[in-house]
């Protein structure tokens, strides 16, 4: 069973698979060098980036992330404001300080980072890091960034962790999850909480989710109050702050029954604009889709009742359980299954989390999740200029409203649904595998080739 902690990770924008994962890989590589006693002998490092990681890597800051990882940084604690100056120094001097300054090595601007368009066999997002001592290659490793900030090296690809802790309710499908809920009389969040308590202490769980919600709120707040143009060739203007001013200033809007939709849009836009700017965000389950889970919880906070720790913990546990089902049985990588694995999964998770808070039965929670995904099936990932901006930012807003609608439809339904959550997860994965690679985060088709940068 995947811990819910793994579904919500504090990190850095703009991409979990192309920024967070590669930074973790770089850090893991230098940690290995230290552990093996090789670090002080290293004189040069080089990186090869493959497949989708290469094709959209520049727009997703993959190169910057790997360099920051090799320098000894982690996505959740890296000083975001210090990154540009550090990268400028590396580019200017062709030298890189590894492992928090322990050793300085050659990292030439022309071939320190090589972008290769071919795929490696195991996954669309692959990278190899090499370390030399003089002319001798002393260490080399292949990493795959499999979505949501998860990384795995070649030896462990597709293998279960051997030291997995036994949990009381080890569900691998929605049917099993519902079976345990029936057996115990527990809600989805209650049942998942019992699993988490086998992995972490109660205090750790409370502290972890307090930090997740606090990071999400801070991100919404920054996004709502920051103006200007997002980085990159598209020159996309931020929209959340102007929308906030409009909503706060206009009396006329307060009589509009659709007013709440504007607020939900604003929450989601705020988060995804921060992500696009390389800010501090929470993967939920990825960065490309990181606005949906917080926007729906912010909606609950503003329009239903103030969110307390008990409320946000229930929400994250239910949403995270659904995310874990997609992670175990399909994919949360846009490079593997298109945007249905990112925005589709986030919509499904948020719908389930909201249904849980609104008092849904375990069946209704799964129906909400199913509706949230069913109407994102076939969604392509075709980011313009390889950046997490168009169509990604606006798409998070649309999917946040869709998640709220999905949970309402699930709870108002009186007939039996024809499509189960397990079937829709299976369908999403097969649809993604059938999808032309042009539509799986390669920026070689769709909007990516129709929309011109100025």
Where in the sequence are the language-model features?
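Conserved phosphate/anionic-ligand binding catalytic regions in large, soluble enzymes, centered on
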Residues: 8-26, 277-296, 337-347
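Accessory carbohydrate-recognition regions in carbohydrate-active enzymes
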Residues: 12-55, 122, 152
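Alpha-helical support elements that line or immediately flank enzyme active sites
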Residues: 17-34, 294-306, 351-359
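Short, mixed-charge aromatic SLiMs
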Residues: 44-57, 89-97, 241, 315-328, ...
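C-terminal regulatory domains involved in ligand/effector binding and gene-expression control
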Residues: 75-253
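Accessory "access/gating" subregions that flank catalytic or transport cores
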Residues: 203-338, 446-454
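Hydrophobic alpha-helical bundle architecture
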Residues: 307, 318, 324-397, 409-418
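Extended hydrophobic packing segments that form well-structured cores
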Residues: 418-454
């Amino acid at each position: 069973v995947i811990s819910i902690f793994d579904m919500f990770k504090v990190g850095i924008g703009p991409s979990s698979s192309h920024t967070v994962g590669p930074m973790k890989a770089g850090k893991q590589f230098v940690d290995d060098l230290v552990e093996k006693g090789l670090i002080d002998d290293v004189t040069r490092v080089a990186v090869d980036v493959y497949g989708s990681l290469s094709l959209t890597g520049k727009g997703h800051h993959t190169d910057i992330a790997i360099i920051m990882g090799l320098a000894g940084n982690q996505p959740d604690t890296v000083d975001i404001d210090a990154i540009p100056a550090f990268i400028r120094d590396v580019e200017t001097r062709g030298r890189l300080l590894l492992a928090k300054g322990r050793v300085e090595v050659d990292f030439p601007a022309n071939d320190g980072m090589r972008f290769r368009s071919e795929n490696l066999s195991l996954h669309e997002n692959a990278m190899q890091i090499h370390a030399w001592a003089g002319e001798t290659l002393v260490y080399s490793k292949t990493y795959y960034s499999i979505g949501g900030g998860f990384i795995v090296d070649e030896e462990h690809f597709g293998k279960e962790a051997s030291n997995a802790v036994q949990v009381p309710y080890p569900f691998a499908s929605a049917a099993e999850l519902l079976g345990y809920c029936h057996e115990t009389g527990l809600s989805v969040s209650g049942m998942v909480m019992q699993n988490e308590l086998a992995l972490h202490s109660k205090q750790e769980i409370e502290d972890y989710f307090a930090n997740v919600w606090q990071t999400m709120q801070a991100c919404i707040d920054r996004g709502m109050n920051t103006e200007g143009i997002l980085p990159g060739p598209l020159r996309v203007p931020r929209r959340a702050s102007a929308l906030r001013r409009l909503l706060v200033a206009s009396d006329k809007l307060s009589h509009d029954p659709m007013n709440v939709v504007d607020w939900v849009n604003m929450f989601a836009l705020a988060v995804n604009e921060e992500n696009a700017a390389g800010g501090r965000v929470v993967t939920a389950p990825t960065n490309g889709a990181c606005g949906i889970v917080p926007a729906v919880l912010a909606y609950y906070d503003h329009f239903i009742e103030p969110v307390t720790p008990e409320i946000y913990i229930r929400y994250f546990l239910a949403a995270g359980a659904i995310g874990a089902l997609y992670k175990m049985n399909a994919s949360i990588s846009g490079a593997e299954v298109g945007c249905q694995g990112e925005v589709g999964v986030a919509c499904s998770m948020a719908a389930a989390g909201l249904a849980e808070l609104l008092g849904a039965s375990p069946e209704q929670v799964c129906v909400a999740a199913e509706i949230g995904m069913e109407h994102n099936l076939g969604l392509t990932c075709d980011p313009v200029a390889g950046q997490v901006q168009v169509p990604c930012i606006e798409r998070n807003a649309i999917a946040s409203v869709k998640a709220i609608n999905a949970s309402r439809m699930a709870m108002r339904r009186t007939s039996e649904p024809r499509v189960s959550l397990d079937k829709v997860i299976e369908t999403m994965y097969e649809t993604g595998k059938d999808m032309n690679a042009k539509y799986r985060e390669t920026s070689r088709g769709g909007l990516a080739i129709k929309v011109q940068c100025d």
